[in-house]
Amino acid sequence: MPAVLLAAGLALYWLPVPGLDEAALDAMGGLGLVGVLPWPVLAGAALLVVAFAVLLWPSRPQRLLLGLVLVATVVSLHALPAVVEEQPRFATAWQHLGFLEYLDRTGGSAPALDARWSWPGFFAAAAFVLRACGVTDPAELAEVVRWWPLAVNLLALVPLALLARSVRAGWRARWCGVWFFALSSWVGQDYFSPQSFTYLLYLAFAALLLRWFLAPSAPSGGMLPGAEAPPDATPGRRAVLLGVALALFAAAVPAHQLTPFVMLGVVTVLVVLGRCALRGLPLLLGVVAVGWVCFLAEPYWSGHFDELFGGIGGLGANVTSSVSGRIEGGSATHQLVLYSRVALAGLVMALACWGWWRRREAGYRERALPVLAFVPAAGFALQAYGGEMALRVFLFALPGAALLAALAFFPRAGTSERERAWDRVSLAPLAALLAGLVLVGGFLVARWGNEAFERVRPGEVAAMEWVYAHADPTVRLLWLSEDPEESVTPALPWGSRAMERVRYVPTQAPRDPVLAGPLAEALREAGPVSYLIVGRGQSAYLELDAGYSTSWERRLLATLDARDDLVPVVRNADAAVYALREAPPGTPEAATPGPPGPTVTWTPWSVLGALSAGLLVLLLGAREFLRLRAAPDAPPSPAVRALFWFAVPLLLVTVSALVHRFWTLA
């Protein structure tokens, strides 16, 4: 029966997909891709949910079928745009190709061009691996971008499965937790980016901690530990696993500005609660993470301290800008997509809280999973993260929240005959089915509801290629924004080449498309070799997310075409590029990428701090490896105590140097 449901679900889901051509995609409105999907596709997605839920009924797991349905669900949910859209989706993924192109062309980074160059680890690793594999052609790189989200979501299942094995629960709860994770991965941070790469590192790091480095916990007050005891391992094997955990963190630090601090927060709270055996790990990881920010990410914060860290403590303002601030304005239909995201995140977190309570009632004490689920919320007190902090918080909270949500339906471990008898008559699989149907329906709306402007159209790519070809020595490209001060990321396949030679200038989009005079004036002020681009993706964004009229793009293009001082230099079905008929006087300025990174201001205090930090990392790392050789409850050895006292003065010097750098350079 489950195999038949799986086959029927896949057939219903994929057979109508070839009928989704470019004309059908052009009809997308406020609901995005789900608004143009044939009903059999939706029925197929529901059948995949039913197939998995049916497999939760038997007394023994059918692992092969469970795995097949899970993988088929992930592929179906995440591969759809890659199959139906002519170009790889999402504008920022194209921009990240520009980082690879710049690295390949110049051999270095350019911190003055973009703050992300202060964390170049992902771009350097991707450029190295792709070149080693012979992937250098732009068409081949585009295919990497196309299939990257699917690969990330499939790879995420591996650490999730390991994380699920750390929970003292029955097989239904473990499989259901991984399933809920897959159905709730609609956040959209899986595109070709440092965030998606470091998210995989975060999942693997958390799985290692909870599987092999949980501190021993004995039953107390009639409550059993909610986590399985770590497997027996020799000191040598534990040392190797610790080395892997440190390598994962070390790979995340130079690749992303947020992920290492989430990893640090999780391990710190686990240590404070007595649930992590690596008691010295927070200090070691903290020195590494803060040291990178203070020294190698100096261009990111130097001179912008208040702008970057002024949001610390502003919990209410950060939550508002991340949640309600992203829903204001826009079309009523598209607001359903934004409200569905809030509702789905709230549903998963509510199920997680219910799961914690049901585990408590069943006699299990959960500590580790709530840490994974709720520690990321501390990000709200740090920064608004460009209005995206709510999405990032849910992204990092999802592994723990999904497993806790599964425990709401299957709270017992099934280790006693009484628990097994209860599971045989429980209607929990039916309840999980209903939850799965809600989650998969919500996924299709929340994940693909922005596709009208997150989709990349062929004509937009052609227009950008024309711009790159004419960026000699530089070019200013004006694009239309509803708020040039706050909305600074265009819905265009921008930045994939010539990073230092194209300056993107957000320009106020007139609410009344007839009033296009300020656009021509902005072109004059931009100077020679300046162009104005009007793309369908950005126009769709303005209509759906900023409340511009549905006829706005058509009327604006007619107005621009009618002006005597403007001439279209590119015109196709998806984009138009305009230039002044009489170019402004002057000579285009030369490209100024700035000095190659890393850019560090060295003072005597900085040199002393860097040397102290390096020695401190070595001492703390050696101390942690030595502690692994002792029994869990054994007192510290003389060598461990000696390393601690040697580390104290180095820590004081390092902290003093870091404070001095922030104070003098901020």
Residue ranges and their predicted role:
Residues L65-V75, L241, A245, V266, ...:
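Transmembrane alpha-helix segments characteristic
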Residues L150, L407, E417-R424, A432, ...:
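Extracytoplasmic
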Residues L56-P61, A227-A239, C276-P282, A350-A373, ...:
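Membrane-interface helix-loop-helix junctions at transmembrane boundaries of multi-pass membrane enzymes
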Residues P38-L48, W148-L150, Q257-L258, G314-R358, ...:
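Alpha-helical transmembrane segments at the extracellular/periplasmic loop-to-helix junctions
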Residues V54-V69, V75-Y199, F453:
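Active-site lumenal/periplasmic loops and adjacent helix-entry segments of GT-C-fold
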Residues Q195, G387-R418, R641-T654:
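Hydrophobic/aromatic-rich transmembrane helices and adjacent perimembrane loops
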Residues L70-L77, W148-A233, R237-L264, L437-G442:
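Membrane-embedded helix bundles of polyisoprenyl
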Residues L20-L33, R131-A139, G313-Y339, P585-V600:
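Juxtamembrane membrane-water interface segments that cap and precede transmembrane helices
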